[in-house]
Design a protein with these regions (language model features):
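HDAC/HDAC-like amidohydrolase catalytic core signature
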Residues: 1-408
Length: 412
């Protein structure tokens, strides 16, 4: 682990109020991951350090969210933020017919009240608080007060200006970036969540002050069905959106290679004032909603490369639907951001703390999984094709010299 820079400071942004929200008992998105992550960080002695603080966020005011979001949509979100609607739905058995009858069509046009985006008491307050957490982290990093910030309940990258989408109600990323742009800053957003960041991409598709880089499972097989390599921005923003769609069963080795060939040179050329990184852990092989074969071994390598290159970084949790694997990955990421080696002081103690069946001998690191044979050949061939397109189409816009792709060296 590299030495921690002098005068380094970091914040873990956390609120019990955020962690205790629940979309529904059966919904795959679990805010409780934030509390479990903080608990595991404490177990690994990753919190009680002189340079680390836990800070509690405040809800973001309506008018700040309205700098990005459509006002009528935010008002609709406020409208469904009532126990009345939640109780109306809970008192009648769930059927498609009931859902259509009990949800106002004017609300449905905002994609509120769907299976993905259920309405529940406190949904507006929850969204405003999550956005406030990301906004706080962005301000602290931008001002230089801290060099690293982590908001585990952040990264709602699917929400659009005028509707909810993909478990996301308020696009905290777009709201924060919009504010940072008003302060004259250049921002890079690096997203390694398995799902493409369609909401953030759409928000800044024509803007050359924001560099959006997303490595994700291909939209040919996974929601939101977007994020192909030829989506590179438009107008002044041409070349400032970069997508690396990954084929199913992509392993650690292939993911890290794709990241190394694209992200560091683009960040160096763009020279942002700060970087926001979405560290979604749904790329994990055990995730129930995705089809990649990564472990937190490759995930940790990528986070480490970001931490080494970026002096000011805001990290957001994003997705991850195997709760325990996600919590382990986020804990590992927090350790890396703070230049710490996680060690479990309870290993070997009879009756000591336990954290699910995945904790093996107190080590947060997974054993990597390798694709082999024709599967590996297919993965490499597809990733080579995507990387070639980016290098030939996007790199020249940023005056990045073309070199032989690392993936081809020694392969012929």
């Amino acid at each position: 682990m590299p030495d921690r820079p002098e005068n380094f400071a970091s914040v873990f942004i956390y609120s019990d109020e955020l962690a205790n929200f629940e979309y529904s008992p059966t919904h795959p998105f679990k805010p409780i991951r934030a509390k479990l992550t903080l608990d595991l960080c404490r177990r690994y002695d990753l919190i009680d350090r002189p340079w680390i603080r836990i800070v509690k966020p405040e809800p973001l005011p309506f008018e700040v969210m309205a700098e990005f979001h459509d006002v009528t949509y935010l008002r609709a979100l406020q409208t469904v933020d009532s126990a009345g609607l939640a109780e109306l739905r809970s008192n009648v058995p769930s059927t498609p017919e009931r859902d259509l009858l009990t949800i106002d069509p004017q609300i449905l046009k905002y994609e509120l009240g769907t299976d993905d985006n259920p309405v529940f008491a406190g949904v507006y307050d929850y969204s405003a608080l999550a956005a406030g957490a990301t906004f706080l982290g962005a301000e602290m990093v931008a001002s230089g007060e801290v060099q690293a910030a982590f908001n585990p309940v952040g990264g709602f990258h699917h929400a659009a200006r005028d509707h909810a989408e993909g478990f996301c109600y308020v696009n905290d990323v777009a709201v924060a970036i919009t504010h940072l742009l008003k302060e004259g800053l250049r921002v890079a957003f690096v997203d390694i969540d398995a799902h493409h960041c369609n909401g953030v991409q759409d928000a800044f598709y024509g803007d050359d002050r924001v560099l959006v880089i997303s490595l994700h499972e291909s939209g040919g097989q996974l929601y939101p069905w977007s994020g192909f390599e030829n989506e590179i921005g438009e107008g002044k923003g041409r070349g400032y959106t970069v997508n690396v769609p990954l084929p199913e069963k992509t392993d650690d080795e292939a993911f890290v290679r794709a990241f190394e060939e694209v992200v560091p040179p683009l960040l160096k050329a763009f020279a942002p004032d700060l970087v926001i990184a979405e560290l979604g852990a749904d790329t994990h092989i055990s995730d129930p909603l995705t089809h990649l074969n990564m472990t937190n071994f490759g995930y940790g390598q990528v986070v480490k490369k970001l931490a080494e290159q970026i002096p000011r970084l805001l990290a957001l949790g994003g997705g991850g639907y195997d709760v325990y694997k996600t919590v382990r990955s986020w804990t590992l990421a927090w350790a890396i951001l703070n230049h710490l080696e996680p060690r479990d002081e309870y290993v070997g103690i009879i009756g000591g703390m336990m954290f699910g069946p995945e904790v093996e001998a107190g080590d947060l690191h997974d054993k990597t999984v390798y694709a082999t044979g024709v599967v590996k050949e297919r993965i490499n061939r597809e990733i080579d094709r995507v990387l070639d397109y980016i290098k030939q189409t996007v790199f020249p816009i940023h005056k990045i010299p073309l070199t032989l792709p690392l993936s081809r060296q020694g392969r012929g």
